[in-house]
A protein has these predicted regions:
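DNA polymerase processivity clamps
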Residues: 1-231
């Protein structure tokens, strides 16, 4: 069984995602009842026999990858990732003071609202114009960020591992989630068309998309996975 099951699995999702399938874990009827939790760049699949909690039902076609293929078979220890993580120049985490988005509530961040005008002959006319509340910026004037006390990775950090480039924040999110489940490493099974498949334990697999390039202004740290000893 997985420790801290609900909390750990939710870490693979985005509660404010634009697609419902990325908001919370669900039992995927298109995957033989396995649980799926994803946010678009990372995903976890869990066999139903390992689950203790209840989840909603859903249907989502899986990407066309072979989740059983194992042609890399290298162990990635979380202690090594943490050592690499600490080499980055971290920045203070900031969050909205009131917990709300910085989007203007009148125009939902678009910067435009629709005006209606009825002329002297009774005809109605519509026109999109700058929102009068935010002056077309789409942002709140009273939005304020405050530091949480945590130090986090900036957006431009990457891990490089055997030629694959990973968004460091996403890989670290996987580490934090899988640690909550009670594990201290994952096994890298395969890389397939930009996707990387990892095994947490029997019945639990993780998918993480790699990046095409590191970018011009970035920090990166090399990770060296290890080959497990032959039984």
């Amino acid at each position: 069984m997985l420790k801290n099951e609900k909390k750990a699995l939710q870490m693979f999702c985005e509660e404010d995602a634009w697609r419902d399938v990325f908001k919370e874990p669900f039992i995927n009827e298109a995957d033989n009842g396995r649980l799926m939790a994803a946010e678009g760049h990372i995903m976890i699949r869990v066999e139903p026999s390992l689950l203790r909690c209840k989840y909603k039902q859903g249907t989502q076609r899986l990407p066309n990858y072979d989740f059983e293929r194992n042609d890399i078979n290298k162990v990635i220890r979380f202690a090594d990732i943490e050592t690499a993580y600490n080499k980055f120049d971290l920045i203070p985490e900031k969050k909205s003071k009131d917990g709300m988005s910085d989007d203007c509530p009148e125009c939902d961040g678009s910067g435009e609202v629709e005006y209606e005008y009825v002329d002297s002959e009774g005809h109605t006319h519509y026109k999109d114009c700058d929102c009068p509340i935010c002056d077309g910026t789409g942002k709140r004037d009273d939005y304020e960020l405050v530091e949480t006390g945590r130090m986090i990775l900036p957006k431009d950090c990457t891990f490089s591992m055997d030629g694959q480039i990973f968004d460091a924040r996403l890989l670290w999110r996987i580490v934090e989630a899988v640690r909550l489940m009670g594990f201290d490493s994952i096994t890298w099974l395969s890389k397939q068309f930009g996707a990387n498949i990892f095994r947490v334990c029997d019945g639990v697999t993780v998918l993480a998309m790699s990046r095409m390039e590191q970018g011009e202004h970035h920090q990166y740290v090399e990770l060296t996975p290890s080959t497990p000893p032959t039984p």
